[in-house]
């Protein structure tokens, strides 16, 4: 094509160009943005840019592949889809599974939060959500598709023929790419200062810092769809090109004035030089913009700061809609934590803009704006809005508690560091700016890093380990695991015929009480299903099997005692069938239940954990609100309806690509198997999941279903425990027995238990009212008889009174009421208890500001002995022998003299 290789005069980077005048590689920070002056196709929207890209590559032999969700359900080492190549990792890139097409083209919505603090400041260089358009080619040793020359040619033709860019303005800069354990050389394609694409040639695996060439060589490209739109629209910021009319809508709703166009175009020109994490770079940026626009620096700083906040709200609200639209539930862990981080940063930006518009209104605008591009936003709109509203409520609650949380932390350690700010945000949700304000008001200033939210996001990029089908932790001794891995795959008779109760096999190996056979009917622990138990007979000896584990492809049987057998011996196996059948029922109903939850609660309901045992089943699901009794009844009704319909249940082995294309990513409710073909379990017209477990053949066999408990085990996750089959009757009998015991306890005849309990509750409420009146009477009596004679010590009243009431909670309540009505009072109630003296002491708010009762009690103990303690506004003291109220009052007054 006539390209010449050069090296940048200033940037010292190698690049290829047709232009003899270029001395730099034409991307920032080597040159300023000048693409607004480049002749090209004009005015492409994001949707038009996407379609132009996909259509071009379709015409050039690529198969269009639909995008995946922004939450990486097929990956257990990553929460979010951060690039198009993530779609094909690790199964395709490892060579285990073929790609869905080869070559292919895709436009993948992606989310990256590592630079969230820079969004808006750089006028579009950084976004949290974006579309990565890409064409991929997977070159196998026996099938080469295309490599560097064809990749560069396709990029060149797209930019010149579709976008109409003059060929001499296109630059290919040499670079190097690494990520996800792979690496390779790359070209960055830039025009007019703007990088439009990256072309990566993935050919190495990174192992201990070394590069090993891999047989599968992958063309991994990434074209920024939003950047293509920005390039063709030539607006002062990418946000104008991406969001169009929404920019003015948000500006009006947030009360942000339109900026001086001279300022915005000056910012556009030099924004590529800006390093937002460098304070000096920021200062230079504002000064340069002010100089170019002919304004003063502070005015420019104010304009660009407000604009950056407006743009960050635009960006974040779209990201929130995409995350929740794909089913993420905001929480304190996993991808839910990242969704909450974006929500709370958006709320903080609204606060900094003094905008009172609810975040949910802005998210709704975004969802409706993008519905045509992302249909899931329409399908899940009710959930999206409800979840955002709830997050706003929770954030307001955090702000109400923030001062006490931070002050408690400052008492523990005098100053806060960045790690403390991150911990306060991580564990309590306190925004760093709020924590810093509170700390500064207490004389302990702390600087919040510009990239605070980026630091937090980086700590939550993905899970620490991969679960697969759930066979990663066997609990077996290491030497046994190593021994078991020597054997090939154990034939899984429990899959071939889950109803087989007995089986004859051959011993492959024995190590102490551990046995591996050529085949087995014993199910190993995994996939949330507990192992089988039973007996084996070999060489006329019977052994009880108490555990079964899968190690690699071998299945290890664990006996109660050492097994006397040799390889080749015949082994007879019998499982505890009633136990197995109960587990099969609980496992099958779990599949029915998760599908019911997605219908009743919403598509965001996702399995977060499960366990199936003989006694019961347990399912943890993601859901943003606590479950109600009505929710439980609906779930029970739906599940029991499916049971009554006697739907067929079966398994089938399906190629991974075909399974994902036909059934979506809900097949991975129980984990993501690292396998080429998936074992799918089908519940007729109801549910499809990849699953290793054993199941009944018909939902009618489940027999019945009852949820026995439900609770919120963590933010964003609810737990259901349930029984099926015979266990429903057992549970009903247990309830009857419990009811009978309650009836005996409250002395109620059979059938009258409810009325009797209601009567007792009414009596209890009356007793509480009587107790309240009694406490009020006590407070009034003390006020009338004693307050006037309280001692005064340096502006604090001290009073001690004998108390006939010995119940400690009642005494504490009396003191609380008394000191809340007399804020400068320290009051003590003295109780005689079995010849000893118990003293409860409380201080009103004003008195507590002057003295810590814990310190006061320590002084008293030094004089009279005893033990006790406390801090702040409450303390207690216990002394052997009799101590009068007058003496206690005198001791407290003397101690006060020492303290004040």
UniProtKB/Swiss-Prot annotation:
Its cofactor is Zn(2+). Catalyzes the attachment of alanine to tRNA(Ala) in a two-step reaction: alanine is first activated by ATP to form Ala-AMP and then transferred to the acceptor end of tRNA(Ala). Also edits incorrectly charged Ser-tRNA(Ala) and Gly-tRNA(Ala) via its editing domain. Signal peptide: none annotated. Binds 1 zinc ion per subunit. GO terms for biological process: alanyl-tRNA aminoacylation. It is found in: Cytoplasm. CDD domains: AlaRS_core (cd00673). This is Alanine--tRNA ligase. One of its GO terms (molecular function) is tRNA binding. InterPro entries: aa-tRNA-synth_II/BPL/LPL, Ala-tRNA-lgiase_IIc, Ala-tRNA-ligase_IIc_anticod-bd, Ala-tRNA-synth_IIc_core, Ala-tRNA-synth_IIc_N, Ala-tRNA_lgiase_arc, Ala-tRNA_ligase, DHHA1_dom. Consists of three domains; the N-terminal catalytic domain, the editing domain and the C-terminal C-Ala domain. The editing domain removes incorrectly charged amino acids, while the C-Ala domain, along with tRNA(Ala), serves as a bridge to cooperatively bring together the editing and aminoacylation centers thus stimulating deacylation of misacylated tRNAs. Belongs to the class-II aminoacyl-tRNA synthetase family. It catalyses: tRNA(Ala) + L-alanine + ATP = L-alanyl-tRNA(Ala) + AMP + diphosphate. Zn(2+) binds at residues 587, 591, 691, 695. GO terms for cellular component: cytoplasm. Keywords: Aminoacyl-tRNA synthetase, ATP-binding, Cytoplasm, Ligase, Metal-binding, Nucleotide-binding, Protein biosynthesis, RNA-binding, tRNA-binding, Zinc. It comes from the Archaea. Pfam families: DHHA1 (PF02272), tRNA-synt_2c (PF01411), tRNA_SAD (PF07973). Its EC number is 6.1.1.7.
């Amino acid at each position: 094509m006539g390209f010449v290789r050069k090296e940048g005069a200033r940037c010292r980077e190698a690049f290829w160009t047709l232009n003899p005048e270029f001395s730099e590689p034409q991307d920032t920070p080597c040159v300023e943005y000048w693409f607004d002056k480049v002749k090209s196709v004009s005015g492409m929207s994001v949707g038009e840019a996407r379609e132009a890209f996909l259509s071009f590559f379709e015409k050039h032999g690529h198969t269009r592949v639909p995008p995946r969700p922004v939450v990486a359900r097929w990956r257990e080492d990553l929460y979010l889809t951060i690039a198009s190549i993530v779609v094909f990792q690790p199964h395709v890139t490892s060579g285990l599974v073929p790609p869905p097409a080869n070559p292919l083209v895709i436009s993948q919505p992606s989310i990256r939060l590592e630079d969230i603090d820079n969004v808006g400041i750089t006028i579009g260089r950084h976004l949290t959500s974006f579309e990565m358009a890409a064409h991929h080619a997977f070159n196998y040793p026996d099938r080469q598709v295309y490599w560097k020359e064809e990749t560069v040619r396709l990029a060149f033709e797209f930019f010149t023929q579709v976008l109409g860019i003059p060929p001499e303005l296109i630059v290919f800069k040499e670079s190097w790419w690494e990520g996800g354990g792979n690496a390779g050389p790359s070209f960055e394609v830039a025009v007019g200062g703007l990088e439009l694409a990256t072309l990566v040639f993935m050919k190495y695996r990174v192992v201990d810092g070394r590069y090993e060439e891999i047989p599968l060589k992958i063309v991994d490209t990434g074209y920024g769809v939003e950047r293509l739109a920005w390039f063709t629209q030539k607006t002062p910021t990418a946000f104008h090109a991406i969001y169009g009319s929404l920019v003015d809508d948000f500006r009006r709703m947030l009360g942000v004035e339109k900026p001086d166009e001279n300022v915005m175009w000056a910012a556009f020109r030099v924004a590529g030089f800006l390093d937002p994490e460098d304070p000096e770079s920021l200062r230079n940026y504002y000064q340069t913009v002010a100089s170019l626009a002919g304004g003063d620096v502070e005015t420019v700083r104010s304009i660009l700061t407000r604009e950056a906040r407006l743009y960050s709200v635009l960006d974040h609200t779209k990201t929130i809609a995409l995350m929740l639209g794909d089913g993420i539930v905001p929480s304190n862990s996993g991808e839910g934590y990242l969704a909450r981080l974006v929500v709370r940063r958006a709320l903080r930006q609204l606060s900094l803009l003094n905008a009172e518009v609810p975040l949910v209104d802005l998210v709704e605008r975004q969802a409706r704006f993008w519905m045509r591009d992302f249909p899931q936003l329409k399908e899940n709109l009710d959930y999206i809005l409800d979840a955002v509203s709830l997050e706003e409520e929770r954030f307001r609650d955090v702000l109400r508690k923030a001062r006490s949380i931070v002050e408690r932390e400052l008492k523990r350690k005098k100053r806060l560091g960045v790690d403390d700010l991150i911990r306060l945000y991580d564990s309590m949700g306190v925004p760093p700016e709020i924590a810093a304000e509170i700390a500064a008001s207490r004389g302990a200033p702390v600087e919040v890093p510009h990239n605070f939210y980026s630091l937090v996001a980086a700590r939550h990029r993905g899970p620490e380990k991969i679960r697969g089908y759930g066979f990663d932790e066997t609990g077996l001794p290491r030497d046994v695991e190593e021994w078991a891995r020597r054997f090939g795959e154990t034939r899984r008779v429990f899959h071939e015929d889950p109803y087989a109760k007995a089986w004859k096999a051959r011993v492959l190996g024995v190590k102490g009480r551990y046995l591996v056979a050529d085949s087995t009917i014993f199910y190993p622990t995994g996939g949330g299903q507990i192992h089988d138990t039973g007996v084996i007979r070999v060489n006329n000896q019977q052994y009880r099997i108490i555990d079964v584990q899968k190690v690699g492809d071998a299945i290890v049987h664990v006996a109660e005692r050492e097994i006397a057998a040799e390889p080749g011996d015949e082994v007879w196996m019998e499982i505890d069938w009633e136990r197995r059948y109960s587990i099969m029922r609980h496992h099958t109903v779990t599949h029915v239940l998760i599908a019911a939850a997605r219908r009743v609660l919403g598509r965001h309901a996702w399995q977060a954990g499960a366990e199936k045992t003989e006694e019961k089943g347990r399912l943890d699901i993601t859901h943003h609100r606590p479950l109600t009794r009505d929710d439980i009844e609906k779930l029970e009704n739906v599940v029991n309806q499916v049971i009554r319909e006697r739907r067929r249940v079966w398994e089938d082995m399906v190629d991974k690509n075909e399974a994902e294309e036909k059934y979506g990513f809900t097949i991975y409710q129980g984990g993501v198997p690292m396998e080429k073909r998936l074992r799918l379990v089908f519940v007729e017209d109801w549910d499809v999941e990849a699953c290793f477990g054993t199941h009944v053949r018909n939902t009618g066999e489940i027999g019945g279903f009852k949820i026995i408990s439900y609770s919120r085990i963590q933010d964003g996750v609810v737990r259901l425990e349930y029984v099926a089959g015979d266990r429903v009757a057992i549970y009903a009998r247990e309830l009857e027995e419990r009811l009978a015991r309650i009836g005996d306890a409250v002395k109620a005849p059979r059938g009258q238990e409810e009325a009797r309990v209601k009567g007792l509750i009414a009596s209890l409420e009356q007793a509480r009212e009587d107790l309240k009146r009694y406490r009020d009477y006590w407070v009034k009596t003390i006020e009338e008889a004693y307050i006037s004679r309280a001692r005064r010590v340096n502006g604090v009243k001290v009073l001690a009174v004998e108390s006939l009431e010995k119940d400690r909670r009642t005494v504490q309540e009396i003191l609380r009421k008394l000191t809340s009505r007399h804020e400068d009072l320290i009051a003590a109630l003295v109780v005689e208890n079995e010849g000893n003296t118990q003293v409860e002491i409380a201080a009103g708010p004003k008195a507590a500001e002057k003295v810590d009762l814990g310190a006061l009690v320590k002084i008293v103990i030094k004089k009279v002995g005893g033990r006790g303690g406390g801090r702040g506004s409450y303390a207690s003291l216990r002394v052997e022998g009799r101590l009068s109220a007058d003496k206690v009052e005198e001791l407290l007054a003397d101690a006060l003299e020492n303290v004040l």
